[in-house]
Amino acid sequence: MTLKINSCKNDINNHTYLIGILLLGLISGLTFNLIFFTVPYQLSEAKYTTDIIGSISLAAFPYCLKVIWSPFIDKYSIPFLCSKFGHRRGWALVSQIFLILAMTGFLNINPCNNLYITAIILFIISSCSSTQDIVLDAYRIERPTSKEELSMAFTFSSIGFRLGMLLGSVGTLYSSIIFGWNTVYKSALFITLIGPIVILCIKEPQSKEIHHTTTHLIGLQQYFEVIKKSIISLKNEQQYLLLIILFIFLYKAADSIPMAMSSPLLLDLSFTTHEIAVIYKAYGLLIMIVGGALSGVLAAKMGIFHSVLIGGVIQLLSPLMFMILATIGYDIKTFIITVTVQNFCAGFAGTIISIYFASLCNSEFVATQYSIIASFSSLSRIILASLGGICAKYLTWPVFFLGNTLFSMLFIPIFYKIYRKKLGFVNISKKI
C-alpha cells in the first residue's frame, strides 16, 4: 500500500513538472513571437518597408548571446531567492519579474509611432526571455532521470513554445481586429503573469541542490574560467567542435528566413488576416506539433544522427514551397500545401536538433554549454532574418526564396564530412 502511495506521489510530481515546463515554454513562445511576428505584422499593416521590419529582428539579438551570461546562471546564486527556492528557480523568478516589468512598459507605447523605443523595449524583453530560456533549458536537461523523461521534457517544452506562438499569432490577429493592438499587449502581459506562479509550483532539480555556486559576484577571471572549462569539456567529448558549430549555424537557415519574411510575403500576395490566422497559424501549429512528435518517434528507432540528417534535408522543401507560392500568387490550395510543408519540417527539425543539443552537454556546465550551442543556432536565425529583409527589398520573392534554398544547402557537405568521420556525434547510437 505504501509503495502504491509513493508511486502515485512520484507520478503527480512528474505530472506537475511537465505541465510547468509546458507553461513556461508557452510564455517563451509568446514573447518570442512578439518580436518575430506580432510587432512585424503590425508594422507591415502600417506599410513599413521590409528592411525596417527585418531590422526590428535585431532586437532579438540577446537570444544568440545567451553564452555571455549563462556562466553567471551556472555559478552565481542570487541572495535569498536561490537559497529559498533553489538555484534554477531563483534565477527563473528574477527573469520573470523583469520580463513582466518590460511587458508593462510596452503597453505605454505605439510601435508604429516609436520605432526606436519599441526596439529598446523589445531588446529588454528578449534579454529577460532569453535568460528564462537558459534556466528552462538547464532545468529540462537536469530534471529528467531517464532518456524517456528527457524526451518528454523536450516534447512538452516544444508543445508549450508552439502554443505560445499560436497565442502570439492567431490570438494576436483576431484580438487586434476586434479589440485593438493595446488589448493584444495587455493579454500578453496577463499570460506572462502566470510564470512566477508556475515556478513556485515546480520542484528544484536534485542535481542543483548540491551544486557548487556562490552568492558573491564572480570576477572576470572566474567568469572566463567557467566558459573555458565548458568549451574544453565539450571539445574533449566532441572532436572538431568548430565544424559541428558551423553545421548547427547553417542547419536552421531553411526555416528561419521563411519564418521572418512570411508576414510581408503573405500580405503582398493579398491573403486576408482571417486566412493567415486560420491556415498559417492555427493549422500550421497543429502540423508543427505532428512533425515534432514524429521526430521523437523516429529518433527512438533510428537514433539522433540519422534523424538530424532527415530533418535537415526535408527543411529544404520549406523555401522551395514559398518560392512556388510567390510565383503562383494568391491561391488557397498552394498556400495550404506550403504551410503544411513548412510547419511539418520546422516541427521535425526543431525538436530533433534540440534533443541533440542536450545530448552534447555534461552535468557540471549544463546552462553554459547548452547556451554556447544554442547561441549559434539563434545567431543563424536572427542575422539571416535581418539580412533577409534587406535582400527581399531588392529581389523578387521567387528569386529571394530560390536563393534561400541554395544557401541552406551548404549544410549538406559539412554534414557529409561529419558522417564520414563520425565527428561530434559521440551518441550516434543513443536512442532517445
From Swiss-Prot:
PANTHER family xrefs: MAJOR FACILITATOR SUPERFAMILY DOMAIN-CONTAINING PROTEIN 3 (PTHR12778:SF10), SOLUTE CARRIER FAMILY 33 ACETYL-COA TRANSPORTER -RELATED (PTHR12778)
- Ranges that cross the membrane: 17-37, 52-72, 90-110, 115-135, 150-170, 177-197, 241-261, 285-305, 308-328, 335-355, 372-392, 395-415
Q: Which GO terms describe its molecular function?
A: transmembrane transporter activity
- The protein's name in its UniProt record: Putative transporter AmpG 3
Record-linked InterPro entries: AmpG_permease/AT-1, MFS, MFS_trans_sf
User: What subcellular compartments does it reside in?
Assistant: Cell inner membrane
**What is its membrane topology?**
Multi-pass membrane protein
Q: Which UniProt keywords apply?
A: Cell inner membrane, Cell membrane, Membrane, Transmembrane, Transmembrane helix, Transport
The record's section on Pfam families has: MFS_1
Q: Name one GO cellular component term.
A: plasma membrane
Coarsely, its chief localization is membrane
Give the similarity note. Belongs to the major facilitator superfamily.
